[in-house]
Amino acid sequence: MRPQKSAPFEEFTVDVAFFSGSDPFATETYRIPAATWFSAQQQALHMSVNSVYDNARIPDLRRTATVRPA
């Protein structure tokens, strides 16, 4: 059995934008160490549910994530 080689982690900056319908109202930035940009995006979106901007009283709450190298 050979040891598994894990992918090196890279640091990504992920901007999560919060919308009410099509109107943007806030952005939070996360620095995420991850193996891929997709993994960083998913982690940031998951973390954003704990944001003060994630509020059930906001109509048609949506969010998007933009990933860039740190």
Regions found by a protein language model. Give the residues of each.
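A short, charged, amphipathic alpha-helix used as a generic interaction element across diverse proteins
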Residues: A35-A56
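Amphipathic alpha-helical segments in structured regions that serve as interaction surfaces
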Residues: F12-V14, A44, A65
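Short aromatic-glycine-(Arg/Gly/Cys) micro-motifs in beta-strand/loop hairpins
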Residues: Q4-E28
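Generic structural motif
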Residues: A17-G21, A35-W37, A70
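A short, exposed loop/beta-hairpin motif centered on an aromatic-Gly-Thr core
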Residues: P24-F38
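Short, mixed-charge low-complexity intrinsically disordered segments
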Residues: N50-A70
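Charged, amphipathic alpha-helical segments
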Residues: M1-P3, R68
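Hydrophobic aliphatic residue packing
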Residues: V14-V16, I32, V67
